[in-house]
Design a protein with these regions (language model features):
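C-terminal scaffold of the Radical SAM
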Residues: 1-3, 22-53, 62-98, 109, ...
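Conserved N-terminal Rossmann-fold NAD(P)-binding element of oxidoreductases
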Residues: 6
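Local cysteine-cluster metal-coordination motifs and their immediate loop/turn environment
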Residues: 9-22
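Short amphipathic alpha-helical interaction segments
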Residues: 382-396
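A short, conserved structural fragment
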Residues: 395-405
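Minor-groove-contacting beta-hairpin "wing" of winged helix-turn-helix DNA-binding domains
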Residues: 406-410
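Short, amphipathic alpha-helical interaction segments positioned at domain boundaries
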Residues: 412-427
Length: 427
């Protein structure tokens, strides 16, 4: 089993905070194909190359547990490109998407048997876009709203307005998308607690099934980082961060959201009108289902959960990462180099073998972020003893808690989670 990630690095413009690999595409070369067309062709061929190599080594084609189109901005792709991608996924991974996919019949494409997420920018979601989205097997949309303040959106160099974000969600609802995730940011220069509370109120009014909320990060190499270095902006202080995070957790908890990962919240109780295809798929075969939880939200991101719970994943496209069979690999972060390599029928990636210490460290960094924490029985006796020895001072300070054979962060521990994880890792 594996999750499939498709990286679409194209953006109409760059946001000042983004450190992901992205590019603003140019047109075709003369009368030839556009960069988008050649890149999509290459991604389709990469899927075929990977399965051919797996078969040649005696392996089987991966059974997909989720599909995620991320970026960049997947909603910048033409529908012709999107249909080509999904037809290839259907053929390579033997998924039962309906054969009339790509038509504009009223009922649209049949639901995928798994979670299929597509990231969309609000300004791309026109009425026509939402209508045509029905012709794809997408059953979940992740939208980068970030804030409902037009002033802060301009600061981020986002192209949409708050009103456009609200309208986009409405159009997706009308198109039958019953599983919408909204991304928010907090900790903008000069942002007040009251302004953050207003953003939370706005997102709750939208009724999003899933909410991801992150503090604004100043990543080296971004325009935002250069503003920080020049003294033109200041980072949010620790005290305000804690207050904003507390308000986030408390408000969403009171509104019926499960806080299942440090930055992620999923609605626990569907409304009577919910007919999301994702609700009909119960991931009972995934090893990260937790029996001692009463009822995990059906709106948890299954794809992102695979990263946190040691499920293999396949990354397709420039700069995409893959993990599985004791190895981790990453594709070249250059579109032209990526296309050229695939044309020569070679995978443009580097890889590393994951030894026992690295796997332990990965477990600490990912599983500890989740509500369930680290399942101690999955560690060897050596690593379990090592972990619990280092955890003692954090347990005494109330930053970690051992419960039901699991080690997890407390609310206090989340505030200093990075330093705790660093101390628990094996060096």
């Amino acid at each position: 089993m594996a999750g499939l990630y498709i990286h679409v690095p194209f953006c109409a413009s760059r946001c000042i905070y983004c450190g992901f690999y992205s590019t603003v595409p140019s047109g075709g070369e003369g009368k030839g194909k556009s960069v988008e067309e050649r890149y999509v062709d290459a991604m389709c061929h990469e899927m075929e190359l990977r399965t051919d190599e797996e078969a040649a080594s005696g392996g089987e084609t991966a059974e997909l547990t989720s599909i995620y189109l991320g970026g960049g901005t997947p909603s910048q792709l033409s529908f012709q490109s999107l249909h080509r991608l999904f037809h290839t996924i259907e053929a390579v991974y033997h998924l039962p998407f309906r054969r009339d996919m790509g038509t504009d019949r009223k009922q649209g494409c049949s639901a995928a048997p798994i979670e299929v997420t597509m990231e969309c920018n609000p300004d791309d979601v026109t009425a026509e876009f939402a209508r045509r989205l029905r012709s794809l097997p997408v059953n979940r949309v992740s939208m980068g709203v970030q804030t409902f303040s037009d002033e802060r959106l301009r600061f981020l160099h986002r192209r949409h307005t708050a009103a456009e974000a609200v309208s986009a969600v409405g159009r997706l609802r009308e198109a039958g998308i019953g599983n919408i995730s909204v991304d928010l940011m907090f900790g903008f220069p000069g942002e007040t607690l009251e302004e953050w509370e207003a953003d939370i109120a706005h997102v709750l009014e939208l009724g999003a099934e899933h909410i991801s909320a992150y503090s604004l990060m100043y990543e080296e190499g971004t325009p935002l980082y250069r503003l920080l270095q020049a003294g033109k902006v200041r980072e949010m202080g620790d005290e305000l961060y804690r207050k904003m995070y507390d308000v986030l957790v408390d408000r969403l908890g009171s509104a019926g959201y499960e806080h299942y990962e440090i930055s992620n919240f999923a609605r626990l109780t569907p409304t009577l009108s919910d007919e999301s295809p994702a609700l009909k798929v119960q991931p009972s075969n995934l090893k990260f289902q937790i029996s001692n939880l009463k009822v995990p939200s059906p709106f948890r991101s299954r794809h992102n959960s695979s990263y946190w719970h040691d499920v293999p994943y396949i990354g397709i496209g420039a700069a995409a990462h893959s993990y599985g069979n004791g190895k981790r690999s990453w594709n070249v972060a250059d579109i032209r180099a990526y296309i050229d390599a695939i044309r020569e029928r070679r995978l443009p990636c580097e890889e590393e073998v994951i030894d026992a210490d690295t796997h332990y460290n990965d477990t600490v960094m990912t599983a500890l972020r989740t509500r369930e924490g680290i399942e101690l029985s999955l560690l060897s006796a050596e690593y379990r003893s090592y972990l619990m020895h280092l955890a003692v001072p954090f347990l005494r300070q109330g930053l970690l808690k051992e419960d039901g054979g699991r080690l997890h962060l407390t609310r206090k521990g989340i505030y200093v989670s990075d330093s705790i994880m660093s101390e628990l890792m094996k060096v």
